[in-house]
Amino acid sequence: MSSLETQQPPLDAEMEKQRAELAGIIARNTGEDGSYATAIQSLFVSRHSHSHEFASVLAQPALCIMAQGRKEVRLADEEFNYDPLNYLVVSVSMPLSGRLADVSPLEPVLALRLDIDPAEISTLIADAGPLGVPNRPVGRGLYVERLDTPMLDAVLRLTRLLDTPKDIAMLAPLIRREILYRLLRSPQGHRLYEIAIANSQSHRVSQAIKWLNGNYEQPLRIDDLARGVNLSVSTLHHRFKAMTAMSPLQYQKQLRLQEARRLMLTEGLEASAAGYRVGYESPSQFSREYSRQFGAPPLRDMARLRSSV
């Protein structure tokens, strides 16, 4: 488990002032509850004033900053928390679930997300030359890092551009590049670095993850998957689990069940049709695995979700 288990010192006076300014910018650019694209490419801001049950999502690589409030994120059976003291980095696409904490209409969650293009990381590494990023054992593709002054300053300068839109085209790419550089230079930056290096084992695992994300409804043959990314079966299994906390088969199951739940909730599909759509041939197997994942069979789970909306 990776969470905020120990008491951390608060932000210093200057960082607290910057945090408050960041929260104000997000508040001005949201208005109502929801997540909003901005005039800056790949930058999203969000406001939420009510908590909810854990909601599933196929998260893409991103930097997530919390200006106000807290969010709990689950990867398999592990929990990660981030708040104004700590930011969250998703270094590789993976199925997550999350819920908001410390939230009320008077003090809504105010957050931003900056999507990360792995190709942009690769270009930055090539341009910057040796960054002195240490070689370390492969870790989760999701991590929490303490927010420091340079990172907060760069993020604040990026969001300030929302108030001066004429400056966005010239300055946003430069500040975005600075933010990515600071991520690479952070204590856990090796996790992004390893995935971005072509032909590294972590990069090959990320390619296997990408294939599963686009083909989860297909039968999974581990031998073929390993061969496709030029890894042995044992290496793929070991590194895949180290990165995602799941085996490839468990990962595929998560994707299938999350998508089936979405199909039933948003498109009104019956359980058997949703299960078939995501690759299940047996309705009874789908129902069993769905119940284990979400704590109730599909019909009861849908009734619970719809009543909470």
What are the roles of these predicted feature ranges?
Residues 1-39, 44-46, 52-53, 135-142:
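A short, N-terminal "cap"/entry segment at the start of jelly-roll beta-barrel domains
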Residues 4-18, 121-178, 182, 208-210:
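Amphipathic alpha-helical segments enriched in hydrophobic/aromatic residues interleaved with Lys/Arg
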Residues 35-132:
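N-terminal regulatory/effector-sensing and dimerization cores
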Residues 79, 219, 268-269:
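Residue at a beta-strand N-cap/secondary-structure junction
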Residues 147-150, 175, 197-208, 244, ...:
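N-terminal positioning helix adjacent to the helix-turn-helix/winged-helix DNA-binding module
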Residues 178, 182-188, 195-197, 213, ...:
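Basic/polar phosphate-binding segments, predominantly the helix-turn-helix DNA-binding elements
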Residues 212-215, 264:
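Short helix-to-turn junction characteristic of helix-turn-helix DNA-binding domains
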Residues 252-261, 300-309:
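Short, basic, alpha-helical segments at the C-terminal edge of helix-turn-helix-like DNA-binding modules
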